[in-house]
């Protein structure tokens, strides 16, 4: 049997060679293929399912097809590139920190598969005199006066003199004030970390500072 895991928990069994779905069961073992929650489905079948289950708020695709197992033609494509499933804040933190690894970057963004994104007319990041930045990804528009290491900074982040950012994800528009320290944390966009404040988590229990209420 060829097995694929759905969302890290469900296994889809395909009878070898005939592309017929034989069932879904829970549990995944090391060495089995994980379903990436991506699939191509017949437009007609998808529209039929929308009509059949219109009154339902949410329904898993495999639950919707459960009554048709045995007749649906299912085929697979093996993806061998970099994958980072994100289901928890720790997953999010770890997958972002992995972007500091050049091997992961090269695997995720190969030259032959470019990523096109929206352009922003912001100036390059500027490391001011007296600042120190090591092993970090710093986006355009940032101004660094303090110390940044092993971190990821979104656009237009300001790290003031005497502030320290270590092993952290700082999102767009944040200001880390003088003397503040942020470590093993995720700071959502447009936050201001007050002078002298310490935000510190651990790699296993990451601290999250949510977006300020408007």
Model-derived features: where do they sit?
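Conserved core of the sugar-phosphate nucleotidyltransferase
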Residues: 1-53
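Left-handed beta-helix
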Residues: 53-214
């Amino acid at each position: 049997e060829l097995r694929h895991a759905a969302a890290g928990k469900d296994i889809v069994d395909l009878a070898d060679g005939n592309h017929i779905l034989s069932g879904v069961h829970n549990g995944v073992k090391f060495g089995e293929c994980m379903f990436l929650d991506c699939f191509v489905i017949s437009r007609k079948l998808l529209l039929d399912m929308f009509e059949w289950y219109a009154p339902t708020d949410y329904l898993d695709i495999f639950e919707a097809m459960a009554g048709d197992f045995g007749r649906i033609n299912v085929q697979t494509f093996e993806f061998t590139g970099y994958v980072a499933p994100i289901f928890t804040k720790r997953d999010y933190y770890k997958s972002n920190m992995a972007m500091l690894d050049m091997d992961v970057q090269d695997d995720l963004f190969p030259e032959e598969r470019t990523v096109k994104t929206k352009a922003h007319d912001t100036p390059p990041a500027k490391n001011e005199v007296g600042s120190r930045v090591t092993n970090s990804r710093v986006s355009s528009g940032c101004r660094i006066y303090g110390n940044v290491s092993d971190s990821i900074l979104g656009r237009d982040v300001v790290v003031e003199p005497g502030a320290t950012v270590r092993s952290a994800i700082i999102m767009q528009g944040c200001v880390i004030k003088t003397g503040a320290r942020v470590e093993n944390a995720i700071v959502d966009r447009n936050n201001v970390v007050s002078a002298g404040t310490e935000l510190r988590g651990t790699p296993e229990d990451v601290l999250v500072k949510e977006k300020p209420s408007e």
